[in-house]
Swiss-Prot record:
This is Integration host factor subunit alpha. Heterodimer of an alpha and a beta chain. SUPFAM superfamilies: IHF-like DNA-binding proteins. CDD domains: IHF_A. The lineage of its organism: Bacteria, Pseudomonadati, Pseudomonadota, Gammaproteobacteria, Oceanospirillales. PANTHER family: DNA-BINDING PROTEIN HU (PTHR33175), INTEGRATION HOST FACTOR SUBUNIT ALPHA (PTHR33175:SF2). It comes from Alcanivorax borkumensis (strain ATCC 700651 / DSM 11573 / NCIMB 13689 / SK2). Keywords: DNA recombination, DNA-binding, Transcription, Transcription regulation, Translation regulation. GO terms for molecular function: DNA binding; structural constituent of chromatin.
Length: 100
């Protein structure tokens, strides 16, 4: 089985909720757009029962060019982090090893 895509999510909304395909696709896009806008505005996203998306600042640190071995600085940047919620962790652990 491959990765779950936005198209797969829209198809599921179409099948399970009876939305038409255009509405289902728009709903999925709007969901992710809301998450993007919140993070762009430095607002954490907390999805109860699923997990939290937060922003974290990473400071500059030394790095190395793997081809030449030359030391180069890795610039400071802001990154998105995801922390799974307890319910998600429990569901994943319950199914660990039962599917391949």
């Amino acid at each position: 089985m491959g990765a779950l895509t936005k198209a797969d999510m829209a198809e599921r909304l179409f099948e399970e909720l009876g939305l038409n395909k255009r509405e289902a696709k728009e709903m999925v896009e709007m969901f992710f757009e809301e998450i993007r806008h919140s993070l762009e505005d430095n607002i954490p996203v907390k999805l109860s029962g699923f997990g939290n998306f937060d922003l974290r600042d990473k400071s500059e640190r030394p790095g190395r060019n793997p081809k030449t071995g030359e030391e180069i600085p890795i610039t400071a940047r802001r990154v998105v982090t995801f922390r799974p919620g307890q319910k998600l962790k429990q569901r994943v652990e319950a199914y660990a090893g039962t599917k391949s």
